[in-house]
A protein has these predicted regions:
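Short secondary-structure junctions
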Residues: 38-60, 79, 135-145, 194-200
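Bacterial N-terminal signal peptides that target proteins for export
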Residues: 1-11
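Bacterial signal peptide processing site
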Residues: 24-26
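Short, compositionally biased low-complexity segments enriched in polar/charged residues
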Residues: 44-111, 123-127, 152-155
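C-terminal motif of bacterial Sec signal peptides marking the signal peptidase cleavage site
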Residues: 19-22
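Short, well-ordered beta-strand elements
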Residues: 167, 171-179
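A short acidic/glycine-rich loop-to-helix N-cap element
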Residues: 176-188
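Short Gly/Thr-rich strand-loop-strand
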Residues: 121-170, 185-201
Length: 201
């Protein structure tokens, strides 16, 4: 092999390594979550405590039709994890760098979602595995396009289904829950984030 070819091959190998490293370092995108909320008319909250109050009011049905979301970093992100995502202390204590959460509840539809970015990959892995283990009897797991997933579809009645999906990509988690009679809503949300829908479970 002549010198030119050796140099060309070296650059190609380097490009592959760099490309793979870039792919491996990607996490779920908070900007996508914020755009989804803006497009769907969710009310933005700046303060994690105010958002937690709104979340609790919406989830028990005191504010039918309301939509709320928050995007927070550092201490605010930690507060979102502690007081909203992990409000029942079902998951371990984790150090969170960035968090986006959204919720919508009306008579016949319920939607909640989270994008969480942690200090370390081990936190994301722990939460993903805990959730999958807890609901392994009625879910399906796998890997696709650089992320792991665990999805569930449960029929409550002819007029209501529960769709849940948790997705891990490196040190980040995406969680989506949707209660609705049709798969179209959760399918649309998952398409926005580029992940497999729980309706495929």
């Amino acid at each position: 092999m002549n010198t030119f070819k050796k140099i060309a091959c070296s650059f190609m190998a380097l490009a592959v390594v760099v490309g793979c490293t870039a792919c491996a370092s990607k996490t779920f995108d908070h900007k996508k979550a914020v755009k989804f909320c803006e497009d769907e008319g969710y009310e933005m909250y700046d303060d994690a405590e105010d958002y937690a109050d709104a979340f609790n009011e919406i989830i028990i049905g005191d504010r039918p039709g309301d939509r709320a979301y928050i995007h927070a970093v550092k201490d605010g992100a930690q507060d979102v994890y502690d007081s909203v995502f992990n409000r029942f202390e079902a998951y371990p204590e984790c150090d969170v760098n960035e968090a986006t959460s959204f919720i919508f509840f009306d008579d016949d539809v319920f939607v909640q979602g989270y994008v969480l970015t942690f200090d370390e990959v081990k936190y994301a892995e722990k939460i993903f595995k805990d959730y999958a283990r807890r609901f392994k009897e009625d879910g399906e797991d796998g890997e696709e396009k650089g992320y792991s997933y665990f999805i569930r579809e449960i029929r409550y009645s002819d007029n209501m289904k529960l769709y849940c999906g948790i997705y891990q990509k490196n040190n980040s988690i995406l969680f989506i829950q949707c209660n609705y009679k049709k798969a179209s809503m959760v399918d649309g949300i998952c398409e926005h984030f580029g992940v497999i829908s729980p309706s495929e479970a």
